[in-house]
Amino acid sequence: AILASSGKKVLTNPTGSNFTRGVAASIVAGSTWSGKLDYDIAIIELDEAYAAKFVELVRPRASLILNVMRDQMDRFGEIDHTAQLLEAVVHATTDVVILNKDDKRVNALQSSTQAEVLFFGVSSKLRDVFRSDDELHGEIINADEYAIVELRSMSDEVITLYIDGKTYRYPLSLYGVYNAQNATAVTAMCFALGLHPKDIGRHISTVTPAFGRGERIYVGSKRVILQLVKNPGGFRHALLGGKSIDAHHVMIAINDDYADGRDVSWLWDVDFSSLAQSSIITTGVRAADMALRLQYDEIETLEYERDLKTALKTSLLLTPDDGTLLLYTTYTAMLKLRTLLSEITEVEKI
């Protein structure tokens, strides 16, 4: 969105479908009838496993590696294997690699490339918020590398970044603390691509949530917030962001399809204590598993209901007019929930 606002014609895969089929669909949709791609640049979000295959065919000029988290362990086996897949991406990159200095597995990838390496990160006072996977239940270790862009402070509406020796304040209209880190990473990439920090800030303030990532949908006067969750770190950040929302009801939708990850044991690595006083329904294929996980944190649910449509209907009834319903949901459940919501209200088409 930032590059598009700066005048670039950008090809991307906006639906969140980051397997081969999603990228291929975006390329086909963006092509002319003769197969030409009339764009200045392609910004592609890729699943780790498919990224390693993709770069065998198309070597990226630039790559951005945010973090390595336990995600879909049924596919990847263990987190160090995920890091090896990302190493292939870094090795294939020709011009510049942007790495998170605060994630030790990402940091270590700097030795795997001949391209220029730049780092982004957060200040030491924010490290407790943005813990790496090893630090979720362990000691925080600060890296020595210089960050070309560093997140110094954040609020619900403004982030302060230290960019190449100067301080900038950017308005941010994106829900969730994780978006402050995302904005930091994106700023580093845009800066590496030649955009001026003031231009980045002007454009980043206009970025709206990607669908399902803090997306707001209104059902009458009721506000529904869709928040995608898929690993311990992401769910932790989503819950931290949820503290600033006066949600009247919470629904947690957990599926275990291939795109979600069959193994949902990662739920046991999330601290759900912030939901202790919430009105909660769990739903999806793993509704009972989610309810059991909450019970171990001594959090009672109103009910667990596998059927998404029934659970959504009940949750909307439990949300008062002018109130907020907060939905934490895995990927395939999120797609279904957006479809269900589109049957009763206006939902942006992707």
What are these regions (language model features)?
Residues 22, 53-54, 74-75, 107-110, ...:
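Short glycine-/acidic-enriched loop or helix-start segments at secondary-structure transitions
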Residues 49-50, 70-72, 104-105, 126, ...:
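Glycine-rich nucleotide phosphate-binding loop and flanking beta-alpha elements
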Residues 3, 23-27, 183-193, 238:
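Buried hydrophobic packing segments
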Residues 1-116:
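Phosphate-binding loop of NTP-binding sites
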Residues 68-222, 301:
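Acidic, Mg2+-coordinating active-site environments of NTP-dependent enzymes
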Residues 44, 63-65, 99, 119, ...:
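Structural beta-sheet core signal
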Residues 188-198, 202-350:
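ATP-dependent carboxylate-amine ligase
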Residues 15-18, 67-71, 122-125, 255, ...:
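Short, acidic/turn-prone active-site loops that include or flank metal/cofactor-
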